[in-house]
Amino acid sequence: MQNNSYGYAVSVRVGGKEHRHWERYDIDSDFLIPADSFDFAIGRSGPEAAIPDLSGETCEVVIDGQTVMTGIIGSQRHGKSKGSRELSLSGRDLAGFLVDCSAPQLNVKGMTVLDAAKKLAAPWPQIKAVVLKAENNPALDKIDIEPGETVWQALTHIANSVGLHPWLEPDGTLVVGGADYSSPPVATLCWSRTDNRRNIERMDIEWDTDNRFSEVTFLAQSHGRSGDSAKHDLKWVYKDPTMTLHRPKTVVVSDADNLAALQKQAKKQLADWRLEGFTLTITVGGHKTRDGVLWQPGQRVHVIDDEHGIDAVFFLMGRRFMLSRMDGTQTELRLKEDGIWTPDAYPKKAEAARKRKGKRKGVSHKGKKGGKKQAETAVFE
């Protein structure tokens, strides 16, 4: 692992020109955040040549020759005072278009999820490719795109209806799909007061039960009975044997044509809630693994923490590259339980990841002894 240093060539590339030598930056990418973001700043001690207005320009954020984000500069700010100047640039990846703009009224019934995504992204030539990362490309049932919905909301709604999720790759490719849990861990991160392998600067462990429920009832109205809006003829119930508190919840699913479609959306929601139940946030020095690989969402990481008894592989949901005068270069890693997010994209690979042995690898099991296996697998079967 590289130590805190300024030993990285970090640039913002605009129109073939690279802007370098930044004093501070923050480059954040996360599957669960609709649009990734960047923020750069540099100061100077005196006057210099005027810099053109770059706001609205397409750019690439590049580290050591590798593109880590393609986006749009949303804001450019110049600060001036006696004897000093400061320039700052901030923006988001190309998902910003989809987050800000309203979706067209579009009938997607019968389209595949990939074709629907291509249709929604078509007005933006900056998004040069739309791809599927899943075993199947399912056809869609009737899905209502409500007036006022953004393109990203509509796209997420469509993807979630078949157990998938949208995101942008560093090169600007729009992806609909899920995690491939077959890739080997890119690094082992260790926290120990006695082990000289310790390579973690800071570690936060969070358990959260706010979205864990003892029983969840999912309801939907099949389209064949749409004339009776007061009744829901589709029902599926999930009981969590590990939740000892009485916490019942009812969820109404708007777009489900049959019980199988209802169950798929229900399982996606339950998986998302489970993800919220456990988060590891780790800060390391530098931006690369010991093997020289830049940290990137979608990687898998082996984490050992002797104090909390953690020894397991986790999924890297998000990462944040940072530079500051005080701390040098650092990377914040946001890790989640392996095999939980988008389990329907590659079902066998996700199941293998969930069954892999490990100590304290996710949410705590609050139920009686013996209920562990059922709790870990029931949501995904």
Regions found by a protein language model. Give the residues of each.
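Sec/Tat-exported extracytoplasmic proteins
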Residues: 124, 159-162, 166, 222, ...
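Extracytoplasmic/secreted envelope proteins and their assembly/folding machinery
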Residues: 114-118, 152-156, 215-216, 263, ...
